Amino acid sequence: MKVQTKWFGEIEVSEDKIITFDKGIIGFEDWKKYTLVYDAEKEENISIIWLQAIDEPTLALPVMKPEFVFETYDPVVEDELLKALGDDIQDDNIRVYCALTVPRDITKMTINLKAPIIVDFDTMKGIQLIADNSEYQVRYPIYDILKKEEN
């Protein structure tokens, strides 16, 4: 299917690449269907990926795998909440992403470690949860970390 986006123009998205968030994403509860937009050739090494809403061209959230900035990232969430992803969750099918905030001054870029976005690529269901870990911040500064990784 063709999806109109503000930032990437018209993109082709196969049905099996659509992630459904039954409850939406925090702050964007009305939009339930998304896809990940990234350079497929650099998938393993790319730090920033875009979570693009299927039905809203202007809604594209920058996200990244938290391990890029926090190697030991291990959010504590209630197992009961994970059931929204499906009955038979396999660790191999799960990917965790965290939303970024990129202000005009990119040196103030932050990652939200407190509310991970969890996707089961077997069921293509996603959920955003609040981690119980007190050490995880909503606005964890990452500019210096990304700059160091770039060099």
From Swiss-Prot:
GO terms for biological process: bacterial-type flagellum assembly; regulation of translation. It is found in: Cytoplasm. It holds the Pfam family FliW. InterPro entries: Flagellar_assembly_factor_FliW (IPR003775), Flagellar_assmbl_FliW_dom_sf (IPR024046). One of its GO terms (cellular component) is cytoplasm. Its main location: cytoplasm. Keywords: Bacterial flagellum biogenesis, Chaperone, Cytoplasm, Translation regulation. Gene3D superfamilies: BH3618-like. Interacts with translational regulator CsrA and flagellin(s). Belongs to the FliW family. Acts as an anti-CsrA protein, binds CsrA and prevents it from repressing translation of its target genes, one of which is flagellin. Binds to flagellin and participates in the assembly of the flagellum. This is Flagellar assembly factor FliW. It comes from Lachnospira eligens (strain ATCC 27750 / DSM 3376 / VPI C15-48 / C15-B4) (Eubacterium eligens).
